[in-house]
Amino acid sequence: MSKTADRIAVVSTHFREDLRHWIAADRKAALRILDLMAAILADSFAGIGKPESLKFALSGCWSRRITQEHRLVYRVTADRIEFIQARFHYE
């Protein structure tokens, strides 16, 4: 299990805009995002949403499935978990 208790959650402006979109357009997806965030804070690299380490331009980031089409993208460092985006595939 990943040690995340010492890490703070940081939400990017892009992520916040994406979450606002989901709240207005699809509350079920918005709730899924909140569930994924809780799971990531509990264990950054395992759990629901099929965690996947990303490569190339997003090397160092991870993703989890919101829906078949959309992904939650986040980065984990020693002291923080940064939530980067919550719509589309990787931008």
Model-based region annotation:
Residues 1-8, 14-31, 35, 48, ...:
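Enriched for short, Lys/Arg-rich terminal
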